[in-house]
Amino acid sequence: MSLQSLLYEMHGYRVKPMTREEIVQVALPIAKYLKFTEWHKQRSKFEWILETLNEIVNIEIFSEQEWNELTKGLTQAHYSPNELTIRTTEKTYQLACQGDRDALGIILHELGHMFLMHQTYLHKSNEPPTINENPEWQADTFAEVILESMGYQTKQLSLNFESPEM
């Protein structure tokens, strides 16, 4: 059992393990194909790019009120593999069309679930799960890789607010 396994607690289901490098090998060709790349970083094109996604995946857009009734505000978007459908709010979709990094990250995260082929399976293992088996980490990594290829900053600052010892 690795230290990583001891420190890591996963919520939800397991998927096929993938390293960051394996996710990059999936994400970058998809980003290029869908024209999610730095040289296409023109806000006017994002709406067109997101509209062309409808050829690959259904996108259902809900009003904020409908979404809150449906999800109780627990999530900003959802991907259903059985229906090949991404569901999100009108606000998130519109912000993504305008090139908002956080909104694009939400849509790309859900696309990550689709392109990384996340399915819920029954799974029995005597080994504790690792982060590489976490579908949320994988989808976050997929989104991060594409956002970086588009020229967005994804690394967050870590600030230490603890008072220095005297």
Region spans (language model):
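Active-site hotspot residues in diverse enzymes, especially metal/ion-binding acidic/histidine motifs
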Residues: 1-166
